[in-house]
Amino acid sequence: IVGGVSVAIE
């Protein structure tokens, strides 16, 4: 997931 805080779990 790119474009948010969720980028940390990529």
Swiss-Prot record:
GO MF annotation terms: peptidase activity
Protein name: Fibrinolytic enzyme
Lineage, uppermost ranks: Eukaryota, Fungi, Dikarya, Ascomycota, Pezizomycotina
Keyword match Protease: yes
pH dependence: Optimum pH is 6.0. Active from pH 5.0 to 8.0 at 37 degrees Celsius, above pH 8.0 stability decreases rapidly.
Highest taxon above the source species: Eukaryota
Function: Hydrolyzes fibrin.
Organism expressing this protein natively: Cordyceps militaris (Caterpillar fungus)
Keywords: Hydrolase, Protease, Secreted
This protein's GO CC annotations: extracellular region
Cellular compartments annotated: Secreted, Extracellular space
Activity: how regulated: Activated by Mg(2+) and Fe(2+) ions. Inhibited by Cu(2+) ions and EDTA. Activity is unaffected by Ca(2+), Ba(2+), Zn(2+), K(+) and Mn(2+) ions.
Similarity-based family: Belongs to the peptidase S1 family.
Enzyme Commission code(s) on record: 3.4.-.-
GO biological process annotation, one example: proteolysis
Thermal properties of activity per the entry: Optimum temperature is 25 degrees Celsius. Active between 15 and 45 degrees Celsius, however activity rapidly decreases after 1 hour incubation at temperatures above 40 degrees Celsius.
